[in-house]
A protein has these predicted regions:
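Interaction interfaces in information-processing and related assembly proteins
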Residues: 1-230
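Cys/His-clustered metal-coordination modules, chiefly Zn-binding fingers
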Residues: 198-296
Length: 296
């Protein structure tokens, strides 16, 4: 299991949220058979979505992030609740790309930077809250920093890092960080935090070296007072059920269900988020056809 921590810095003038999520990223890699670059791309997206979801208030609230960068990896979709559970998928999970000029996984090229980032908060109201911003780099962290500034009017420092073993492709570490100064935060504090960017970029490396999340944060922001206010366990968890897939089939309507019965004599649906397959026999489809008729 991973963990999310929340806290305050610099005499309570700066909000801090961080995550260690090796298991989240590795579970996603295993479920989707991800290439190394897609492990990094989806992993980063899962980490930021999980942190944002943890800020939701209601037990049934959901937050979904949709990255449409226009790159060959396709769209990335992740959903989280406020209890640390997150799930997600990437459209082209097997994509392989050469390393970038720095010798690192070319996440930016895989994701693309010509599209849009969308955040959907479903708070159980009549309509969900939807925020959007343009992609700026495809590195994901920079794109979410842009989103916080443009869509939520909250300047933020965002870091996301996933360390992937170059030999077997397994995840060695995953870490994320959101730092947000409050409106009354002094300029010198903001400057001090911005000076820590080189250290911030070492977070995944520290986690890979076995340094605990809180200790890593204190090392990064050494000299700035820090108080941790909350900690939460996290994990990759899909909440798909057979009943939910039945409702999907019913929603297709009588004509399409009848077509499945006549031509396919059954149906097999696959959950995008966890790749679990659900098979429905011809008789089961006939039962759903009856329910679809009652619903009309």
């Amino acid at each position: 299991m991973g963990r999310i921590v929340r806290g305050l810095m610099a005499n309570d003038t700066v909000k801090l949220m961080a995550i260690t999520g090796k298991d989240i990223c590795e579970t996603a890699r295993e479920l989707h058979g991800l290439s190394r670059v897609c492990t990094a791309a989806l992993g980063r997206s899962l980490l930021i979505t999980d942190m944002m979801g943890a800020q939701l208030k209601g037990e049934n609230d959901k937050l979904t992030t949709i990255i449409k960068g226009g790159g060959p990896a396709g769209n990335i979709v992740c959903t989280a609740d406020n209890r640390g559970h997150v799930k997600g998928y990437i459209e082209n999970p097997k994509l392989e790309l050469p390393l970038n000029d720095s010798g690192k996984l070319n996440v930016s090229m895989a994701v693309g930077w010509f599209g849009e980032l969308t955040v959907v908060r479903d708070l159980g109201l009549k309509e969900p809250y939807v925020g959007k911003s343009n992609m700026v780099s495809g590195e994901i962290a920079e794109d979410f920093a842009q989103y916080f500034t443009v869509s939520e009017q909250q300047p933020s420092m965002v870091y996301l890092g996933v360390r992937v073993d170059p030999h077997d492709g397994k995840v060695r570490a995953g870490g994320g960080l959101i730092v947000q100064p409050m409106p009354f935060c002094p300029d010198d504090v903001i400057d001090n935090i911005q000076d820590r960017v080189p250290m911030v970029k070492m977070l995944a490396g520290m986690l890979d070296d076995g340094i605990e999340l809180e200790a890593s944060l204190k090392k990064i922001f050494d000299g700035i007072d820090m108080t941790f206010t909350e900690t939460m366990e996290t994990g990759f968890r899909c909440d798909c059920t057979r009943e939910r897939l039945e409702r999907v089939l019913i929603s297709l309507g009588r004509d399409e269900l009848s077509d499945m019965i006549e031509k396919e004599h059954g149906a097999e649906l696959t959950c995008h988020f966890c790749n679990k397959k659900y098979s429905f026999s011809e008789d089961e489809l006939k039962g759903l056809l009856e329910e679809a008729g009652k619903a009309q």
